[in-house]
Amino acid sequence: MASSKEYLEYVLEQCPEETASRAMMGEYVLYYREKVFGGVYDNRVLVKPTPSAIGLMPDAPRELPYDGAKEMLLLENLDNREFVKELLERMYAELPLTKKRKKTERKENHENPDYQ
């Protein structure tokens, strides 16, 4: 089941201003200051199990965002904006930098007479 845009909007309202999202296969990847910290999967917010996240949410259920993925932590207290802000700020230093996507160059096809 894909996540709804309405739920994504609610999630972004609860997160600090520096939070962004990107649609991916019916779900949403979440970024804090341009680093991936988790995502919205089946209308659930799952975050990476960094030491800070585990420390702040030691009893959080571990769930799979999709088949074949690594376990992530379920963010259950999304309504507490101060907690969410503290969680993301603590996780930030532990998250890897997001790799920039390379733009693919369009190859010319001289054999195709319709190519312009």
Walk through the language-model features, giving the residues of each.
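Charge-dense, helix-prone N-terminal extensions
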Residues: 1-116
